[in-house]
């Protein structure tokens, strides 16, 4: 969860 792609969470959350 973040601006583009956060590689620090369990799942890659892409927020527009």
Swiss-Prot record:
One Gene Ontology MF term: alpha-amylase inhibitor activity
The free-text function statement in the UniProt record for this protein reads: Inhibits insect alpha-amylases.
The organism sits in which domain of life? Eukaryota
Task: Kindly provide the name given to this protein in its UniProt entry.
Answer: Alpha-amylase inhibitor DR1
Q: Which UniProt keywords apply?
A: Alpha-amylase inhibitor
């Amino acid at each position: 969860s973040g601006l583009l792609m956060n590689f620090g969470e369990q799942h890659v959350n892409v927020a527009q």
